[in-house]
Amino acid sequence: MSLKYGEIIKQMSLEEKALMMSGKNTWETVDFEKYGIPSMAMSDGPHGLRRQAGAGDHLGLNASLPATCFPTAATIANSWDEKLGEEIGTALAEEAVTMDVNVILGPGLNIKRSPLCGRNFEYFSEDPYHAGKMAAAYVKGIQSKGISACPKHFAANSQELRRMASDSVVDERTFREIYTTGFEIAVKEGKSKSIMSSYNEVNGVYANENRHMLQEILVDEWGFDGYVVSDWGGSNDHALGVMNGSHLEMPGTGKSGMRDIVRAVKDGTLPEEVLDQRLDELLNVVFATHQATVDGKGKKFDVEGHHALARKAAEESVVLLKNSNNILPLKPGTKVAVIGDFAKTPRYQGAGSSLVNPTKQPESILDVIGDSGLVMTAYEQGYIRNRKPNAALAKSAVEAAKNADVVLVFAGLDEISESEGLDRTHMHMPQAQNELIDAITAVNTNVVVVLSAGSSIEMPWFDYVKGIVHGYLGGQAGASAMMNVLTGKVCPSGKLNETYPLHYEDTPAFHYYPSKERSSEYREALYVGYRYYTTVGKKVRFPFGYGLSYTTFAYSNLSVDKDGVTFTIKNTGDVEGTEIAQLYVGKQSETIFRPVRELKGFARVTLAPGEEKSVHIAFDDKTFRFYDTRTNTWEVESGNYQIMVGTDADTMVLVGSLDVAGTVAEGGYSKEILPEYFSGKIENVDDIEYRELYGREIPDGSWSGEIQMNDAVCQLYYGKGIFGKLFYGVLRILLKISEWQGKPNLNVLFNYNMPIRGYAKMTGGFVTMEMARALTEMANGHRIKGTAHLIRAAVKRD
């Protein structure tokens, strides 16, 4: 295979080539001035750059340069606006080049398997098509300025608990249809130059060294020609990763990674021509993105313009969930009581590696209400974040509520509820907030709850309030965007990217999530989110794709042909509004189990009062396909398909059908062997049926009784060594302190979920792999042997 940069590579020594495959430091690749190879800088940035000014660290403990804090991915996904996603991506890139950033580590598009995942605020959707389309838009925007996007985390990375020591056990059809389709769209349509592998194993093999994922799917099938980077500290066997399709381990590991590669080349397990090919692919992106940052040096980005874009993005993404008696929009002069700590101190972004230092002080409702035309009769805090109910604060809030025309209660999830490194344990809002809403509705019937949260929540007070408006995490301009919606300056058009179940116990993965042992079994298979609820007919609070407007829309004139669907939408209300029409496809089959319907397209249409438009949604290569594990390829089953246009996943307003000549006459599944999967009732799939679906023996993920290098630090509690138990105990105390303070301790969370070998990957070579092995021995109670091993390894370290 010819190499684009073969002339450079052939001049390099084996050690120099090997050194290039690990980072120079936390954020940059190795540079070689004598070969003209520049360093390539990476930065977190799914919804805003986190370029650190001083010494870099993965968790953002050191301050980052000011950057626009856009709404998070979960927020923007509610807009269903690909053009908006591309605009945000372009703005992110414009900021990146002024900060000498070549690669933006985002967007994140893991599937929202469960509402409890702590990073759901960073991810687009529970649906892979929706997630993929939004991600591709971001990628196009970012790469339009000559730098690289880096979709993450590839793949089946659905929980934060023990995320670096977890094995996602998932059948191949589910893996392809649900957990990789979004990445496929981002790669094929967005032309992403890089991909970040996930921390977890997939069917027993770490993602960063999984040949099936990185070579057979990513390169051979999708045509990916960029580079793969490990998640920070996520490289397990560096040489095996390079052999199987990975390129770059981050952060830098000193000379440890270089020695691993050199050793593998010399012992024949990594052919040097494979190393050369990986280096060539990496250099292609290094050189391709270099000029953009050279051109951007010394330039400034449009702070005001990007702030305005952040507001526009938040406005398009607000979801109106309830509007009884048209309590909204609020008319000028309405006397409102503003209740809730979130009105004064907004929660506008999530916590973790995506934390942004905004260019402007984030707006609060109290900052913007003065220009709204409303009359604020009182503001009361009502509750203390992450604390038990406060009777005095609640009493003052209730008194204020008595004298208002409308009460605006600002509520949601606090900082400790959603963060990288932890998962929620329930779907409740804090007790203090729920009790406060109950008390206020007892004295005033005109209550509107304004929510801030990055994932779905339970709403026990739903029947007692007249309005519910959800802003998700709206970024630095989220408050003015929300006020514009509340007062009718903006007509709400957002629709939910995820289902809101009535109770967490109703969710399809309830019995399987999160995994406490190493194996995380995806027994619910295809039935994620609305695919489950619609198939079994389970009632939900709000379906996927749901959202109200201040106007109304009528659908008519459905036409279906081989190319797609055409229909008419009319604005039948009194104000201009935007509707998001959704295309769903379903098929009954005796030999292939399927959800009753799946999203296959969508259109965002803006209409003036009385205006109507003809809308066309085209079919594509994903409309009718399923992954056939008999042929290990995508197939289309012949037969009659139901073609549906809906306002959300539950409400189909136009229904047609189409006969499709497929590639196979039937599937290879049996109702007798897989009865639960054909019915969709997958709440308690037994081992026999799951083994049939999985196609192999289900791995035993239970702990072996001995601490291993790839066991998480949180498992040291079970070890025999006193030092390991003490370290675990200290971490637990620190976690409790952070919970009490109401802010996640990212450093502690990272350590808590990290495997022991992670210390050899995250300390820049200070801890070697041999030292990590010695620590493992000590954790198993071999104190003398382990200490001696540790000393020897430390002496040999260079």
Features from the language model and the residues they span:
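Glycoside hydrolase catalytic-domain context in secreted enzymes
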Residues: 1-622, 640-644, 649, 738, ...
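Enrichment for repetitive, rod-forming helical segments
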Residues: 24, 159, 688, 698-699, ...
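Terminal connector regions
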Residues: 621-668
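Charged, amphipathic alpha-helical linkers/stalks
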Residues: 656-725
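N-terminal, non-catalytic alpha-helical interaction modules of very large eukaryotic scaffold proteins
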Residues: 727-730, 734, 738, 742-745
